[in-house]
Amino acid sequence: VIQGLNNQGFHNIIVVDDGSKDSTFTVATTLPVHALKHFANRGQGAALQTGITYALTQHPQPTAIITFDADGQHRPEDITALATPVLEGKADISLGSRFLSHSNVPLIRRITLKTGAFLIYLFHGLWLTDSHNGLRCLSLHASRELDITSDRMEHASEIIEIMKTKKWTYTEIPIIVHYSTNTLQRGHGGLREAFRVLARMIWRKFIK
């Protein structure tokens, strides 16, 4: 993944090891990246906030911040198109969408994602074709305002809630996601995660 980013001209890379038990952090420290580590597994939302906070600390005036999955699902080739609206001042946040181009999303995951998008619309009034995609580009303004408090997968819904509350301008850009046997196997817990996300959305909307 890092080599692919380097090949596309991206070199200011932050890797957040979210308490993994393998050699991810050790390997990352040997590569030309900023390697950060959570000593306990906290979840993707926590890892994103750690990385964004670090980026703003090290570079108080970044042109933009990209969030990019480290499992090989995202293509570095999609970053330029994703970042263009933000760099041109046309959007505060640019969101990658698997459903604006030829989609190779497996059926079960497609149903889950479309259901999630519908719930996002019901709760927040924003219609997005792909509400839970990890490939995003944030402007400096959005990066500073973002404060993710949901540690796990429900962070994607929280980001959209923040978009609505802060009145960020946004756009969706077509991307291609590569699914491997490993990433599909990890997706088998998707129903449980979906219920967790729904419960969190209800709590934030009606109880908090």
Please describe what each predicted stretch is.
Residues 1-7:
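Short, well-formed alpha-helical segments that are part of the catalytic scaffolds
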Residues 9, 30-32:
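Short, structured coil segments at secondary-structure junctions
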Residues 11-13, 169:
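Residues at the starts of beta-strands that form the adenosine-phosphate
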Residues 17-25, 72:
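A conserved acidic beta->alpha catalytic loop
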Residues 34-55, 76-153, 179-202:
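Acceptor/aglycone-binding surface of glycosyltransferases and processive sugar-polymer synthases
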Residues 59-73:
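Short beta-strand-to-loop acidic/aromatic patch adjacent to the donor-nucleotide binding site
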Residues 64, 92-93, 170:
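Short, Asp-centered acidic motifs that coordinate Mg2+ and/or phosphate
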Residues 127, 148-151, 160-178:
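Catalytic donor-sugar/metal-binding loop of nucleotide-sugar-dependent glycosyltransferases
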